[in-house]
């Protein structure tokens, strides 16, 4: 059954009004608030609390290596053609796992394992097997665990795909970005159409449970017509999930982006048309619009979770997993434990040095206050469910003993008057509900509850909403 999504109109004035730098809210507070004054002992305390609660676990491992730079990339990467450079890194990750694993109650179910990058398939099969076994020996996976990996389709063959499936991965994701050759040239990611269809065919033959592909809009030389052609070809691939990300052009943070022709970037008006067409075209193809940038088939777990009001969000994006603790391994990885965020060192040197001293390789972190936890829940509900129940929030955090929802968020509710007048949300007797127009600008709605975004200069740290 096709799920339609109403077309919404934006005036130029409204577009300019809301096209501001805003976090993507994969966490609250955003990762930009992590600081080096963080007390590493809070990391241990958070693990202990999770042990006491028997909180399920998700694991993330960062593989930073890439054969060449993709100019659009905002991830932490190491560009090298020297494969042996990977071995010392894998040994260091193994050391981190050996430090963390004894602290974690083995009775806690590990429901997710994800490898991201970088390019995880930069690893040889022998290296991948070593890392996989190191992780699963220390953290036995639940029988129904989601075990996923990101790949660059330029660097795989049929044997590699089948070996990943045999190793234990049951989900796979790869980036297309755009089928258009001019766009691919501009971003230094050449992926012939025939190759992408061949890789998808191998993945289906290997019987992965779920396949996700990533697209990006806002890249150089893109326009409405060319991107709709990319959408058409993507639908022919028939992935289970499609992520369509708004390109974060932040050359002041990611200098490699300066290699792209800035003059060829589509304006905000064109990007909005692209996003609206994306929603229309993919829903016409039978996909369900999930969150702010994901699409899934109606029988996919993401779509089911959204229908049930059970969709969640963490540093990896939207997930079906309930409240779980996320342990991050490798450089730059972020752990998300109870009321604590902790990020590993960003450089190999600092990462290696810490582990050589048998010290947790934590560079910075953040301990959430009660107010942070409340606001995190509000933002998560808005980003995942597109509605907010004041009664449920009051019950969860005992707000009624001191003040109710309306008192606690009096300032924010007043600020929402403007967004309501612009048609982004509507008030309910028991809270808020986001409109179809508001879903496209959901980051703007969430930002009203972000106390860390008051400093205007911080907006320069984030990509624009449109």
From Swiss-Prot:
S-adenosyl-L-methionine 1 binds at residues 60, 117, 150, 334. Pathway: Porphyrin-containing compound metabolism; protoporphyrin-IX biosynthesis; protoporphyrinogen-IX from coproporphyrinogen-III (AdoMet route): step 1/1. It holds the Pfam family Radical_SAM. One of its GO terms (biological process) is porphyrin-containing compound biosynthetic process. The keyword rRNA-binding does not apply. Belongs to the anaerobic coproporphyrinogen-III oxidase family. Monomer. This is Oxygen-independent coproporphyrinogen III oxidase. The lineage of its organism: Bacteria, Bacillati, Cyanobacteriota, Cyanophyceae, Synechococcales. The gene is hemN.
